[in-house]
Amino acid sequence: MPERHTLPARYYTEPSWYAAEMERIFAQMWLAGCRLDQIDARGAFQRRDVAGASVLLVGDGAGGARAFYNVCRHRGTRLCDVESGVFAGSIQCPYHGWTYDLQGRLIGAPQMDEVEGFARAGYPLHGVACAVWDGHVFFNLSDSPAPLREQLGDLPARFAPWRMDELRMVHRVEYDVKANWKLIVQNYNECLHCPIIHPLLNRMHQYLGAANVPSTETYCGGAMGLKDGVETLSVDGRRRRAPLPGLGPEDQQLVNYYAIYPNFLLTLHPDYMLTVTIWPQSPDHTRLIAEWHFHPDEIVRPGFVSGDAIEFWDVTNREDWAISERSQQGISSRGYTPGPYSNREQLLWDFDQFILKRAQGDQRGREEEVGSQGDQGGQGAKN
């Protein structure tokens, strides 16, 4: 590709730009929230906070999910301050006791029967659009979102062999990273750093052998082959679990890495799935939830182990988060100017274009502003 450069510092540091991303990207697109098996019991819930909203994802006990804003319709009190749990048949506000059923309908409002004309039917919880893809529960803060399938494109067909809806979560780790959320996505989408940052991962992968698919406006990614003798990504490269049932021989030799914009990193292995959801907190602070998912037939098998896969990615993740924090430190300093992308960083350029198109709706400024930044050494950060 022609010489192209990274984004100026302000896209990683300025509160005003961060606010634009939250409003025009995170509040408009479908976000990966949790897995359906985490809320499969009636009343089970997960809480997610993003883009100035707090959302409750609630299981209906019949294989479905609903989403509501975590706000009482009486005087705006937050209904729930824990991240997960089970509502015992209803959701009650801790302030004045307004109570809602699991469909969000107001069923109790103390003393409101004294108010002339008050009707409980007029004050349900505000709903949030919710949809499920292969066991992944998504929500959308927009008032009139396009169907989830439009954002996913061809991914449901591409990943059908993994039968992700059958997989079950075994382990979860939360990380707080002192870096802009975009640095997390960019780091995920290239492996030029692997020989330097990831000694364990580099022993497993042909790091220059990525086969990326053409990026779309909603995702980017591709597959990387395992080295000879490596069966999966684990601490020693051995696979201690059977391959996922739907995979053919070719897929059993690959690991698929896909960033589904804006907050979902999906990594599919021959024998398990790793998901990372991204929850921006501020321009330089991101909360990440990593979860490891395995096939239920393996989970119940005597001798089942998952620690080899969990340790592998926990080590690798922490290496990635540490270098992302150092990137944030450098980009935030006076010495930073945009640097040139290599030909193997096309996905990062594609992601930059997604950000600019969605958050400001005009890509011309990007070309004009950073197209010739490579000769500006010695100057201060371009903010």
Language model segments and positions:
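Non-catalytic accessory segments flanking enzyme active sites
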Residues: 7-50
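Small-residue-biased low-complexity repeat regions
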Residues: 361-365, 371-380
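C-terminal catalytic domain of Rieske-type non-heme iron oxygenases
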Residues: 40, 58-59, 64, 70, ...
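Rieske [2Fe-2S] iron-sulfur-binding domain
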Residues: 38-143, 149-157
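Short, contiguous pre-domain boundary segments
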Residues: 1-9, 165
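Short clusters of hydrophobic/aromatic residues that line enzyme substrate/ligand-binding pockets
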Residues: 33, 79, 106, 201, ...
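Short Pro/Gly-enriched beta-strand edge/turn motifs at strand-loop
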Residues: 28-38, 109-114, 257-262
